[in-house]
Regions:
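Structural microenvironment flanking redox-active thiols in thiol-disulfide oxidoreductases
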Residues: 84-120, 130-137
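Hydrophobic beta-strand anchors of alpha/beta hydrolase catalytic cores
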Residues: 72-73, 100, 146
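Short gly/ser/thr-rich secondary-structure transition/capping motifs
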Residues: 31-32, 52-59, 126-129
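Aromatic-flanked redox-active Cys/Sec active sites in thiol-based oxidoreductases
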Residues: 74-79
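A generic structural signal for alpha->beta connector loops
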Residues: 43, 48, 97, 123-124
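Thiol/disulfide oxidoreductase modules built on the thioredoxin-like
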Residues: 7-11, 118-122, 129-183
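N-terminal targeting signals for export/organelle localization
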Residues: 1-52, 183
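A short beta-strand-turn-helix
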Residues: 49-72
Length: 183
């Protein structure tokens, strides 16, 4: 018993600290709703969007962002399965008359262009953000993310995830309908 009493308590601190870190990491992984994090952009003017155009004549300018009516800004990529899942809904929304600006992030330009040619282009203009800087400025965690913008260029709502399913119906659609009725 003499050997056990000589082990300093400080030797156990790294083990306790490690267990604490593992627990905190595990709890962080359990948060699966990116929409639970409020956007700091709500009520603020929309940040600038990359001046890189995905194709000629598709620059998203501040003037376009402040044009009349409700607009959506959708961050997407051709390699993103949830982006593919929401594409039909974006086409429907665009067909209804809402202007949608796209920001293609961390994608190959040719793949993005091919995707829009094959499946249809719901965007009035599309910015190309190969390094993800615009996405960072907007606080995008992963594509797809969609922002509702008013005619003053102010961010009204942020929706993380595809525009499909129950979350779309219960969270995005009411915010979108409210924005349309208040324009």
């Amino acid at each position: 018993m003499k050997g056990i009493s000589n082990i300093p308590i400080l030797m156990f601190l790294p083990i306790v600290f490690f267990i604490f870190l593992v627990g905190a990491f595990y709890i962080g992984l359990q948060r699966d709703d990116d929409n639970s994090l409020p956007s700091v952009l709500i009520g603020e003017l929309a940040p600038n969007i990359s001046k890189n155009e995905l194709y000629s004549g598709s620059e998203v300018t501040h003037e376009l962002m402040k044009s009349p009516g409700i607009k959506l800004v959708n961050f997407w990529a051709s390699w993103c399965p949830p982006c593919r899942a929401e594409h039909e809904k974006l086409l429907e929304i665009a067909e209804s008359g809402t202007v949608i600006f796209g920001v293609n992030i961390k994608d190959d330009k040719e793949n993005a262009l091919s995707y829009l040619q094959r499946y249809g282009n719901p965007f009035q203009a599309v910015s190309y953000d190969p390094d993800g800087r615009t996405a960072i400025d907007w606080g995008v965690t992963a594509p797809p993310e969609t922002f509702i913008i008013n005619n003053e260029g102010e961010v009204l709502f942020r929706f993380a995830g595809p525009l499909v399913g129950q979350d779309y119906l219960s969270r995005f659609l009411p915010a979108y309908d409210s924005a349309l009725s208040n324009e």
